């Protein structure tokens, strides 16, 4: 049935039947694909369809990632929660700061290893089923951390958590390519990723509240934190299974006209949900394309600041003169500001079709925030707190345009899924592993200069690399236009 449905809505097949056949040339491979030469799509009809999709997809996807990020990063809150009374994670599990860092690193090791297989399974099992499985699993595992009493248990559970959380973010970015055109993705990735900044803000507030539950029913507050924040993921998995739409071809809340419109819109720039591609052929071309490795290297540069802020913001604020539960509460403003900036930058990047330069500008702002934090005196608490807010805003705002830029410059369904997973697995995971080492516990009184210097340097690298890759794409496009005599029917690189 699925196959017949796919054939019915296959653009090439319908083009041949109607006799309205044109071709679109792939600037990368030189291959040509048939398409239907139909009337231009009405802007009003497209807006109505996009809004209908948005209501079903974006809030639910953002909520899923909110819970994922909450369960991933709460170990940073647990580390210092009620430390003054000896009821924190490190004390009760007899872990050193080095042990804690290893436990963080193990998570990202699993994260890097399982992202590509997870994206393959997302396509095979359908998004709603696979994401629901991931969600229930990571929620249960996060709750299991509440029962940890030693270093070995914490490390093993964090590895398992990394396995099941690995597939979510690259999966969601891949998932959006089934529904949205390239110029529509960055802002939607931003709304999803921005839920991580909300999770960071709410995580601090929740930890502050849960801290007052210390020893309730004989259970330490950090254990309550894992239970309270893991349970919603398990419960929500059932909701996701039934309400997350898979593909435009399969949903029943689109009319026949809307479904046809959705498929027409994505004929060139979208992934095909029921399309059976030559996966190995696409995979080989993806693996050997050097410009994609440039994207992965850039993503490595942004991943270290992202992970270090995610895991060490409570520790950083604790080193800024805020003690105990107040340190948890002071993690809220940096994430709140980052949320707003992230949305605005991504909206502008999509509106101007200039993702590379927006990422470069955001990275520069973040680098300046970290640089100022590194050179200011350790006792300049208020100024360094302001710099932390600037650094977080710049670092987080850089990511959605980068991911939108990558996905808009890949031209087959299999390649999109693989490249996104490789970007976050080969680029993101090593960067995030590096991020767990740079904020050294013995530098707390000095203001963590090593962490700030490393993040500043990496963000300056990201800015320069984005500009260089943007110039390369411009050169390639001008060359293609000269060789073809015009841009009609030729697929060019996006900026």
UniProtKB/Swiss-Prot annotation:
Instruction: Report if keyword Transport is assigned.
Output: yes
GO cellular component annotations of the record: plasma membrane
Predominant cellular place of this UniProt entry's protein: membrane
Q: Where is the composition biased (Basic and acidic residues)?
A: 7-20
The record ties this protein, via SUPFAM superfamilies, to: MFS general substrate transporter
Region Disordered, residue ranges: 1-24
Q: Where in the cell is it found?
A: Cell membrane
For this protein, the parts annotated as crossing the membrane are: 102-122, 130-150, 159-179, 189-209, 224-244, 292-312, 329-349, 356-376, 386-406, 418-438, 449-469
Q: Does the keyword NADP apply?
A: no
Q: What is the membrane topology noted in the UniProt record heading this document?
A: Multi-pass membrane protein
What keywords tag this UniProt record? Cell membrane, Membrane, Transmembrane, Transmembrane helix, Transport
PROSITE patterns in the cross-refs: MFS
GO MF, one term, reads: transmembrane transporter activity
Q: What does this protein do?
A: Efflux pump that might be required for efficient secretion of pyrrolocin or other secondary metabolies produced by the pyrrolocin gene cluster.
The UniProt similarity line reads:
Belongs to the major facilitator superfamily.
The name this protein carries in UniProt is MFS transporter prlL
Species of provenance:
Fungal sp. (strain NRRL 50135)
């Amino acid at each position: 049935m699925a196959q017949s449905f796919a054939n019915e809505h296959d653009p090439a097949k319908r083009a041949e039947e109607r006799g309205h056949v044109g071709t679109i040339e792939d600037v990368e491979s030189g291959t040509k694909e048939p398409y239907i030469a139909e009337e231009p799509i009405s802007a009003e009809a497209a807006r109505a369809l996009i809004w209908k999709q948005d209501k079903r997809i974006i809030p639910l996807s953002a909520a899923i990632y909110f819970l994922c990020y909450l369960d991933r990063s709460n170990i940073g809150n647990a580390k210092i929660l009620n430390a003054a009374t000896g009821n924190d994670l490190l004390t009760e599990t007899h872990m050193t700061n080095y042990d804690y860092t290893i436990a963080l690193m193990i998570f990202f090791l699993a994260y890097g290893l399982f992202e590509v297989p997870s994206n393959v399974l997302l396509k095979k099992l359908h998004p709603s089923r696979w994401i629901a499985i991931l969600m229930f699993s990571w929620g249960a595992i996060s709750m299991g951390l509440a029962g940890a009493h030693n270093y070995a248990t914490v490390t093993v559970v964090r590895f398992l958590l990394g396995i099941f959380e690995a597939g979510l973010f690259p999966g969601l970015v891949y998932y959006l390519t089934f529904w949205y055109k390239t110029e529509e993705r960055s802002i939607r990735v931003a709304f999803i990723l921005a839920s991580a900044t909300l999770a960071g803000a709410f995580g601090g507030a929740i930890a502050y509240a849960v801290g007052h539950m210390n020893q309730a029913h004989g259970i330490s507050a950090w254990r309550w934190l894992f239970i309270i924040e893991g349970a919603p993921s398990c419960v929500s998995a059932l909701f996701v299974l039934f309400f997350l739409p898979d593909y435009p071809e399969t949903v029943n809340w689109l009319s026949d006209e809307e479904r046809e419109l959705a498929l027409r819109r994505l004929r060139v720039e979208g992934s095909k949900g029921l399309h059976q591609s030559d996966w190995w052929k696409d995979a080989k071309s993806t693996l050997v394309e050097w410009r994609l490795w440039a994207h992965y290297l850039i993503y490595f540069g942004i991943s270290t600041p992202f992970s270090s802020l995610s895991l060490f913001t409570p520790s950083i604020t604790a080193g800024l003169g805020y003690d105990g539960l107040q340190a948890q509460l002071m993690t809220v403003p940096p994430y709140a500001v980052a949320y707003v900036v992230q949305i605005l930058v991504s909206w502008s990047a999509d509106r101007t079709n200039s993702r590379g330069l927006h990422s470069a500008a955001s990275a520069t702002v973040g680098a300046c925030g970290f640089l100022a934090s590194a050179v200011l005196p350790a006792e300049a608490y208020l100024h360094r707190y302001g710099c932390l807010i600037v650094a977080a805003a710049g670092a987080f705002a850089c990511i959605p345009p980068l991911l939108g830029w990558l996905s808009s410059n890949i031209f087959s369904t299999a390649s999109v899924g693989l490249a996104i997973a490789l970007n976050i697995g080969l680029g993101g995971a090593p960067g995030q592993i590096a991020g767990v080492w740079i904020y050294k516990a013995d530098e707390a009184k000095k203001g963590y200069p090593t962490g700030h210097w490393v993040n500043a340097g990496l963000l300056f690298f990201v800015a320069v690399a984005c500009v260089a890759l943007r110039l390369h794409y411009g050169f390639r496009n001008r060359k293609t236009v000269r060789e073809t005599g015009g841009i009609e029917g030729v697929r060019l690189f996006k900026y």
